[in-house]
Design a protein with these regions (language model features):
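Short, Lys/Arg-enriched segments at the junction into DNA-binding effector domains
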Residues: 10-15, 126-158
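Active-site residues of response regulator receiver
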Residues: 63, 91
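Charged docking surfaces used in two-component/phosphorelay signaling
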Residues: 25-33
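The feature encodes the CheY-like receiver
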Residues: 24, 67, 95, 113
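Conserved phosphotransfer cores of two-component systems
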Residues: 52-55, 77-84, 105
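Acidic, metal-coordinating helix/loop segments flanking the phosphotransfer/catalytic sites
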Residues: 40-59
């Protein structure tokens, strides 16, 4: 089984928004074993409420095909409300146009069903690392970084 990243003083909260009961039960079990705290929403409206609730989840796993809204619509609504929580779209939509649509809507990563649990866990860990690295929490590799220089461009990160 995969390991969580080392700096893990608190449990990572994942919101899983999917209406497939068997899949959510399997994912909840796997994520629990990995040490994540999982909350499930079986429709988009409930997922939207939980995504905006305090404290916000640390990561969101969002299905495209929900009974009331599309995952893309939910993602757009989450983003328009100012929530920056990393979102992974978990879907059967394997078309490039669908991937682009989801990424343009604000999804951070995209995983096509069927998928391997190992790949899902690796993607969640990567999203978690990116979120910690840019959150200013002091946990990221470059947490003390004041300036970022790329080519002729220099950015003050403070």
């Amino acid at each position: 089984m995969a390991q969580l990243p080392e700096p893990s003083d608190q449990t990572i909260r994942i919101l899983l928004v999917d209406d497939e009961v068997r899949l959510t039960e399997l994912l909840r079990l796997e994520l629990d074993v990995e040490g994540y705290d999982v909350e499930v929403a079986s429709d988009g409206a409930t997922g939207l409420i939980k995504a905006r609730s305090q404290p916000e989840p640390d990561l969101i796993v969002l299905d495209w095909n929900l009974p009331d809204f599309s995952g893309v619509d939910i993602c757009q609504r989450i983003r328009s409300s100012g929530v920056t929580t990393p979102i992974l779209m978990l879907t059967g939509h394997d078309d490039i146009a669908d991937r682009v649509k989801a990424l343009d809507a604000g999804v951070d990563d995209y995983l096509v069903k069927p998928f391997s649990i190992e790949e899902l866990m690796a993607r969640l860990r990567a999203m978690q690392r990116r979120a910690q690295g840019f959150s200013g929490s002091g946990q990221g590799k470059d947490a003390g970084l004041t300036f970022l220089a790329v080519g002729g461009l220099t950015i003050n990160t403070q």
